[in-house]
Design a protein with these regions (language model features):
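Short amphipathic beta-strand segments in non-cytosolic proteins
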Residues: 45-65, 143-147, 153-159, 269, ...
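Beta-strand-rich domain onsets/edges
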Residues: 2-32
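Disordered, acidic Ser/Thr/Pro-rich linker "stalks" and the adjacent N-terminal cap
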Residues: 7, 13, 96-177, 189-257, ...
């Protein structure tokens, strides 16, 4: 108990120690929040909890006693979306709108619904920086050649940044014909790639056929992730070359073919939008998640109209558990 009030169970274990300061080091700071963001039912002397989201729930990670015009939570680190709450002895009662907490500056910004609406296109339900296969793609290159050893090759596309969707379509600038095409993974990538296909015209839906070529062998040493997996029509299997460097996979068309379009799918953890799955988008307001409707994905993206300035959560009702709170920033999803 604290000042006659019951503490949340997470803080009742006397041998627990907060080690935030040890790991956060110079980024460790006290979070200071103005009491203006609290709901009216919070009074002086009440214990207030700083909470982080875990899927659609909130978990307290720090507490303080509300005494003055602001609340101070000791030993915290930013780069999160948080929310304030009280404990009624049975459950947490959320007492603020969510807010972003910046790691570098320590500033917070409320995520409050605005009257103005805006469109958002969703491509995934979990942050890409948690997906190893996505991180390994920048620096990879798609090439075309008429030499089977690719000693003289043209660059069709150089991967500069993380692919942000499942199906990525590229239109090469070069108007040439090639007998051989390939994807060569960057150093340290094990040539991770799930699928790719080449097309003779931009309007084609039927991919060119050819003999699968590439560097044999996989990290698992059992053939389960060899280069031919890139052409098994399964977006969730992938090539995983036996060494970090020099892996590649491609096609021999038999004769030179013009390439006006190609598509690729990165190695992924199945957190992109999955065609046929049922999704529901929520936004937080008035102490709860509010539904913006369910959709059956018709492709690898979803389109919604949302209130500006809100915290969002995308739920896959068909499968999977990897889901995380996010907001719209510069037109794209930003996860916290």
């Amino acid at each position: 108990r604290q000042q006659g009030k019951m503490m949340h169970p997470a803080f009742r274990k006397p041998l627990y120690q907060d080690v935030t300061a040890v790991y956060a080091d110079s980024l460790n700071r006290d979070l200071v929040v103005s009491s203006d963001i609290l709901c009216k039912e919070v009074h002086r002397g009440d214990i207030v909890y700083f909470c982080l989201s875990t899927r659609m729930d909130w978990v307290p990670i720090a507490w303080t006693v509300f005494e003055e015009d602001s609340l101070r939570f000791q030993d915290t680190e930013g780069s999160v979306i948080g929310c304030l709450a009280t404990w009624n002895g049975k459950r947490l009662v959320m007492q603020s709108e969510p807010f972003t907490y910046d790691k570098m500056s320590g500033t917070i910004a409320l995520l409050t619904p605005q009257s103005e609406k805006e469109d958002i296109t969703l491509y995934f339900k979990f942050p890409l920086f948690c997906d190893l296969g996505i991180l390994r793609m920048p620096g990879g290159v798609f090439e075309g050649s008429n030499d089977s050893q690719f000693r003289s090759a043209d660059t069709l596309y150089y991967v500069k940044q993380w692919p942000f969707r499942l199906n990525n379509t590229i239109f090469p600038e070069k108007e040439k014909s090639y007998r051989y095409v390939r994807y060569k993974g960057p150093k340290g990538s094990y040539c991770n790639i799930a699928e790719m296909a080449f097309f003779e015209d931009t309007s084609d839906t039927l991919a060119l056929k050819g003999r699968i070529i590439g560097t044999p062998g996989c990290f698992q040493k059992d053939g389960s992730h060899d280069y031919y997996k890139v052409y098994d029509s399964n977006p969730y299997t992938y090539m995983d070359y036996k060494t970090p460097d020099e892996g590649w996979v491609g096609l021999d068309f038999g004769i030179p073919r013009r390439i006006k379009k190609f598509t690729y799918i990165p190695r992924n953890s199945d957190n992109f939008i999955h065609k046929g799955d049922v999704y529901e988008l929520f936004y937080w307001h008035d102490k709860k998640w509010n539904s913006l409707g369910r959709q059956v994905a018709k492709a690898d993206s979803l389109n919604y109209v949302i209130p500006k300035g809100v915290a969002l959560f995308l739920k896959n009702h068909t499968e999977g558990k990897d889901e995380r709170i996010f907001k719209k920033t510069d037109g794209r999803q930003q996860f916290w």
